[in-house]
């Protein structure tokens, strides 16, 4: 395949954490890069500026909560700016003991299968004993009884002409029984689901231009014609939905 090399500059790592219950490290951590450059064979380089990853985890009353995010100030290709990116997740009311138990069960049963598959080896079968099945059920009941919440607070892509953003919030709850039919089980487990998608019209055209750039197209008029046509098509499909602004 095409060789890929990466050049990292201006790496800064910060951590203020301590071990809480189980295997959870509580506190804040961050990683920042001034630039990350990817070189792929004879193609133009992809350059990401002001890249950061950050997170915080806290525990109170046996419940875990946290914030985790990623930022990319700007991605450029062949010296031309394409877009920046921001993503922020939050989580709260996750029972620490239930999460710890589920992680341990995952390590014992699922991780060996994934490791074998990654090494192109014959993977063992995932089989739970009666005791493990009961443990899984108990852990899930305990987890959902705490009414955990998880949210993609914002995922956004920003170009020079606008922004496309997505947010998603999910509240979970314990169902009356795990033996319910799948549709009813899902309905009872998801207490609330809110999602919002918003796209500035100009971002569609920016995306088309970026794709043309990645594909090596050089005819400016053809690229602009494609961008205009697909922008109008996307606008027409989104009429009345409130997605485009």
Q: Could you say what each language-model-derived stretch is?
A:
Residues 1-245:
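Glycine-rich, small/hydroxylated-residue low-complexity segments
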